[in-house]
Amino acid sequence: MRLWKAVVVTLAFVSTDVGVTTAIYAFSHLDRSLLEDIRHFNIFDSVLDLWAACLYRSCLLLGATIGVAKNSALGPRRLRASWLVITLVCLFVGIYAMAKLLLFSEVRRPIRDPWFWALFVWTYISLAASFLLWGLLATVRPDAEALEPGNEGFHGEGGAPAEQASGATLQKLLSYTKPDVAFLVAASFFLIVAALGETFLPYYTGRAIDSIVIQKSMDQFTTAVVVVCLLAIGSSLAAGIRGGIFTLVFARLNIRLRNCLFRSLVSQETSFFDENRTGDLISRLTSDTTMVSDLVSQNINIFLRNTVKVTGVVVFMFSLSWQLSLVTFMGFPIIMMVSNIYGKYYKRLSKEVQSALARASTTAEETISAMKTVRSFANEEEEAEVFLRKLQQVYKLNRKEAAAYMSYVWGSGLTLLVVQVSILYYGGHLVISGQMSSGNLIAFIIYEFVLGDCMESVGSVYSGLMQGVGAAEKVFEFIDRQPTMVHDGSLAPDHLEGRVDFENVTFTYRTRPHTQVLQNVSFSLSPGKVTALVGPSGSGKSSCVNILENFYPLQGGRVLLDGKPIGAYDHKYLHRVISLVSQEPVLFARSITDNISYGLPTVPFEMVVEAAQKANAHGFIMELQDGYSTETGEKGAQLSGGQKQRVAMARALVRNPPVLILDEATSALDAESEYLIQQAIHGNLQRHTVLIIAHRLSTVERAHLIVVLDKGRVVQQGTHQQLLAQGGLYAKLVQRQMLGLEHPLDYTASHKEPPSNTEHKA
């Protein structure tokens, strides 16, 4: 809200509050002046203290208004930081007004003074308005002058994005239960039945005691006991059905959340997985979704049950004694405020705990997935120490949670104890003065204990809900995330020649925005031809593959497939006509048949066998115990490196792709297997456009076109003989290889490319 509007509204209310309160006070004390009332103040008969409370809250609002008006940038911040002050003031005045009503009832039975009732009601109206106006002033937008550098309220930093409100997150979470509305209605019905049955139990228990102590009637006692038994049985059955339905509903919610989260994750752009650790994503998908469904289901169940019980208990309590009911409710606002403070703190701690657990999970996942490497360096103890340090960070946060919970239980328990002692003392006074019977006092005390248990449960529910909401915010952060690179192409022609053109391609990884990996790169891949990319490490060879696979967006230029931008093609179609075999292919924990036919809806077994034969994999597959039904293990761990490459080659060839990319695809093969695969590729060139990234001279020299990259630029193009004749970088690389001075067609460059994500492809 603008500053002048907030100031006008606040000043208008302060004037109204002081005027109305003063008028009511004056009409209620026509028989004496203000000075006389001050000199002879009687707390049992005067409302001077309520008038003074009005002046105090008006001064607070005026001070807040002046502070915001003088500095519209810093003032609202200070008000937001001091919300606890106005909360305590309103809470104290509200409790004092209740106590004032009880004191008046001691000398005026009943209270018939309309001016007292008018001031009593107006006090609560003005307290609510004061609290709201404080919040209104805290949301004032600063003027332009207040934001100028050098101003008192100018801090120079941008405000952090506001966190999504807990209520909105909870509402969004519950919206995922819409398909289960019928189940929720049934569960709510049985919840109400069970809660009402539990609410009537103390009443009929008191009736049973009265029939023995007062009426001394066995018939009335038997009737009361039968009713108690029926209520207990009925409420127990209803509670069991309610719990079962809620458990079913939130189990379905858990499945729904995980499915939505997983679908959102697999739709993200490739850069997203470069920036986020696998352990963090797995933690969101497993522990966070489980925590959300478990905590929210359990706590919503408890909250609804206790809400219904509280409603019934409050009705019975007011019917027994309105005075003791006011005494009871004096303490509960304090408990609610403590619960609110604790809940916010616990929510923040919960998010920190989940993040710390995710970091620990990432460490464990990284170590276990690379156990052979860890063992080869005898680094087991060091990895265990790293994991222990991560767990110790979690433990430190757990200690904070324990301390916060201890303080919360201590504060709420002490408040409940004060309320119970006050009820006993004041209730005894009412019984002695004849305003209440002893039986009603006993019944009221029973209901007060029930109410206390309900409020304690609601308090624990709040902290549990905040913990669940904290996890839900992390889950929704990924569910709601829109990928920055959308695969919305629609082209899917029946015939594709397979011509690929790189036109002035400039590319930068999002994780390294200031380093251009490719700079104005241009070359073409022709149908029926083999093109080889060579160059030093970090020259951009694998980046060209990533771009051709449409993994990343370009910063400049374009890549064309048959004259059309690759982004214009349908996502599934594009990766059916372009197949990739990487240096370290990833197999899935499935059978060899399923791995070869991965990503294809239906593939005849004969085509699987034919592709395996072309990839020189059929022989070793048939030697396995289960043949093509053999499970490859996690990431193909049951197969050797060469066997995995041949299965990955078969996975690419079974698609009969117009464009075939081999990124060091034969590096783990023996010479004979490599020769057979090369023969299969060169023998079927009329159906493939082949791009090879290789370091072996035997693989490169047979290519129809060799493209030499250096530092992200194309420095040479031609056949093997042409490039040797030209001299230059390619000739140096060949010479070094032939002399054995360096690894084949490669040397260490000044920079390295980030790990390629192409291992997720065939």
Curated annotation (Swiss-Prot):
Major location category of this protein: membrane
Residues the record lists as binding ATP: 535-542
InterPro entries reported for this sequence: AAA+_ATPase (IPR003593), ABC1_TM_dom (IPR011527), ABC1_TM_sf (IPR036640), ABC_transporter-like_ATP-bd (IPR003439), ABC_transporter-like_CS (IPR017871), ABCB9_6-TMD (IPR030254), P-loop_NTPase (IPR027417), Type_1_exporter (IPR039421)
Site feature: Intramolecular salt bridge with Asp-17. Essential for the release from the ER: 57
Keyword annotations of the record: ATP-binding, Lysosome, Membrane, Nucleotide-binding, Peptide transport, Protein transport, Translocase, Transmembrane, Transmembrane helix, Transport
Residues that span the membrane, as ranges: 7-27, 47-67, 84-104, 116-136, 181-201, 221-241, 315-335, 412-432
Topological relation to the membrane, as annotated: Multi-pass membrane protein
The keyword Membrane appears for this protein: yes
Site positions per UniProt: Important for the second trafficking step from the Golgi to the endosomal and lysosomal compartments: 45, 49
Reactions performed catalytically: a [oligopeptide](in) + ATP + H2O = a [oligopeptide](out) + ADP + phosphate + H(+)
Chain positions of site Intramolecular salt bridge with Arg-57. Essential for the release from the ER: 17
One Pfam entry name: ABC_tran
GO biological process: peptide metabolic process; peptide transport; protein transport
Domain ABC transporter stretches: 500-736
Tissues in which the UniProt entry reports expression: Highly expressed in testis, particularly in the Sertoli cells of the seminiferous tubules, and at moderate levels in brain and spinal cord.
Subcellular location: Lysosome membrane
Enzyme class name: translocase
EC nos: 7.4.2.6
Family membership: Belongs to the ABC transporter superfamily. ABCB family. MHC peptide exporter (TC 3.A.1.209) subfamily.
Quaternary context: Homodimer. Interacts (via TMD0 region) with LAMP1; this interaction strongly stabilizes ABCB9 and protects ABCB9 against lysosomal degradation. Interacts (via TMD0 region) with LAMP2 (isoform LAMP-2B). Interacts (via TMD0) with YIF1B; this interaction allows (but is not essential) the ER-to-Golgi trafficking and strongly depends on a salt bridge within TMD0.
Functional summary from the UniProt entry: ATP-dependent low-affinity peptide transporter which translocates a broad spectrum of peptides from the cytosol to the lysosomal lumen for degradation. Displays a broad peptide length specificity from 6-mer up to at least 59-mer peptides with an optimum of 23-mers. Binds and transports smaller and larger peptides with the same affinity. Favors positively charged, aromatic or hydrophobic residues in the N- and C-terminal positions whereas negatively charged residues as well as asparagine and methionine are not favored.
Record remark: domains: Divided into an N-terminal domain (TMD0) comprising four transmembrane helices and the following core domain (coreABCB9). TMD0 is required for lysosomal localization and LAMP1, LAMP2 and YIF1B interaction. The core domain is required for homodimerization and peptide transport activity.
Protein name (database record): ABC-type oligopeptide transporter ABCB9
